[in-house]
Amino acid sequence: MLGLRNIILLSPPPTQITRPSLPPVNFAAVEDNNTVGEKVCRDCGNRAKKECLFERCRTCCKSRGYNCVTHVKSTWIPSSATRSSSSPSERKKKLKIDKQSSPNVSLLPTTTSRQERGFREGLPGKIEAPAVFKRTRVTAISNNEQAEIGYQATVTISGHIFKGFLHYYGVDHNKAFPCLSQK
Amino acid sequence: MGMVGLRDVFLVAPAYHHQNAGVISGSDHMNSNAAAAAALGVGVIPLLTAGTPQQNVEDSDINFLGNNRRWQNNNNNHETQYLHFKSTNQTTVGTSSNNSGSGSGASGTATCQDCGNQAKKECKQRRCRTCCKSRGFDCSTHVKSTWVSAARRRERQVMPTGANPTAGSSLSTSSGTKKPRIVGSQQQQQQQATSHTSTSNTPPQSFETSSSRQDGGGSREAWPGQVRAAAVFKCVRVTAVEDGDDEYAYQAVVKIGGHVFKGFLYDQGLEPKEGFPSMSDLHLGGSANNHNGVSASAPILDPPNVVYGGGGGSGGGFYS
């Protein structure tokens, strides 16, 4: 027990020496074989690529609607398909988001996309603003499911552009919301 | 030989998951885990399980123990939800190999419909934690808990590994082939993925349907391709996994074509000058002066709702 504790106490100083420039000292997994300083996704904690400017994994880049240069649409195969190697035809499954949902506004990815403190305090809690809703098609991983219709919304609030996907929730039985398409 | 290695990697992850859930316990599984770990260089999992009772003094381990307790509580909920899932959806028959061996556990793994990660069988939406959060589903399985991120888990695993010379030698032997270790690390990451989104309003009960599929192709064509209209956006706080700064996003609930769409709008950065018309700038300028952001027309969402409230608010927030 004492030996284990001594060994544990000796390991933190090398990581601090390895990363002197990062303000939040993260004791990430440092291995001699791997490259030092692996990134983790800021939303879900999964491992993110170093080239991603938004510091997020593929899933969170997709869900946030970022036009990430690194996580471009490709012939990516989910890990469950590679795990089930019994049938090779299942490797054709792909994560599909229709390319027609790309916005007209070409936003340049910025490394400092975080919101500053003064900007956050000035954000209104509730706002009614004109927005653009574009229909998009979200395809599930397995090809058995039909494509699902969603809407991509883009709005400008306090000089910032907010963008995201609105997913289908069901029929409005109680008529709680006014219909936007009838306006 | 490589295929055998891949299969051994497959066997490790569900056994680890079951051990955390408290379903499978025995020396045979420990031996099999140790053998697979020695073969592939993933010698961290048994060390973590073995080292847990010795490190009760540290705060992070206490969180881990709390996480174990929470999982045990969730395990009871999972069983009832699984029965409920079977009773509601009889058309989509899921695999009924929950408590069987690790081999069939790997074959019967439910995958997330959005990203392909490994999803829990008890989740009605058949999605992982990350996609349930991003889609705004009020999933009772993926409830906010004292979850520890994969990076911190790997951080704890590496400390005894770096000190252990035998584990170092196994890592050096596995350095020749990168694919098995990457797959192993991905399996560890898939089971621990979440994003803490604290929204003040939960969707009403009438929208929580186990089968959220859309109608046939005919009604889908009735939905317009593009709509320019004013909608109400509610500010929500999105918390990062680490203790970094929070970020604010906007939640929108709109009705298009008689159906309700809901989602989160994230900050993309400053607006380009040539991007949007000046009408929105003038409107936003007027709204920015008013700190409450109450518009002239009657708002769709109720004003007395707490904007920055925690998760699990009242269900009637969307009714006016």
From Swiss-Prot, chain A:
Residues 100-113 have a biased composition (Polar residues). GO terms for cellular component: nucleus. One of its GO terms (molecular function) is metal ion binding. It holds the Pfam family DUF702. Keywords: Activator, Auxin biosynthesis, Auxin signaling pathway, Developmental protein, DNA-binding, Metal-binding, Nucleus, Zinc. A motif (Required for homo- and heterodimerization) lies at residues 157-160. InterPro entries: SHI, SHI_C, Znf_LRP1. Residues 41-68 bind DNA. It is found in: Nucleus. The keyword Nucleus applies. Residues 79-121 are annotated as: Disordered. Residues 79-88 have a biased composition (Low complexity). Zn(2+) 2 binds at residues 41, 57, 61, 68. Zn(2+) 1 binds at residues 41, 44, 52, 57. Transcription activator that binds DNA on 5'-ACTCTAC-3' and promotes auxin homeostasis-regulating gene expression (e.g. YUC genes), as well as genes affecting stamen development, cell expansion and timing of flowering. Synergistically with other SHI-related proteins, regulates gynoecium, stamen and leaf development in a dose-dependent manner, controlling apical-basal patterning. Promotes style and stigma formation, and influences vascular development during gynoecium development. May also have a role in the formation and/or maintenance of the shoot apical meristem (SAM). PANTHER family: PROTEIN LATERAL ROOT PRIMORDIUM 1, PROTEIN SHI RELATED SEQUENCE 6. NCBIfam families: LRP1_Cterm, put_zinc_LRP1. Belongs to the SHI protein family. This is Protein SHI RELATED SEQUENCE 6. It comes from Arabidopsis thaliana (Mouse-ear cress).
Swiss-Prot record, chain B:
One of its GO terms (molecular function) is DNA-binding transcription factor activity. A motif (Required for homo- and heterodimerization) lies at residues 256-259. GO terms for biological process: anther development; auxin biosynthetic process; auxin-activated signaling pathway; pollen development; response to auxin; root development. Residues 168-177 have a biased composition (Low complexity). It is found in: Nucleus. The keyword Cytoplasm does not apply. GO terms for cellular component: nucleus. Keywords: Activator, Auxin biosynthesis, Auxin signaling pathway, Developmental protein, DNA-binding, Metal-binding, Nucleus, Zinc. Residues 112-139 bind DNA. Disruption phenotype: No visible phenotype. Restricted to lateral root primordia. Pfam families: DUF702 (PF05142). Signal peptide: none annotated. Transcription activator that binds DNA on 5'-ACTCTAC-3' and promotes auxin homeostasis-regulating gene expression (e.g. YUC genes), as well as genes affecting stamen development, cell expansion and timing of flowering. Synergistically with other SHI-related proteins, regulates gynoecium, stamen and leaf development in a dose-dependent manner, controlling apical-basal patterning. Promotes style and stigma formation, and influence vascular development during gynoecium development. May also have a role in the formation and/or maintenance of the shoot apical meristem (SAM). Modulates root growth. Belongs to the SHI protein family. Homodimer. This is Protein LATERAL ROOT PRIMORDIUM 1. The gene is LRP1.
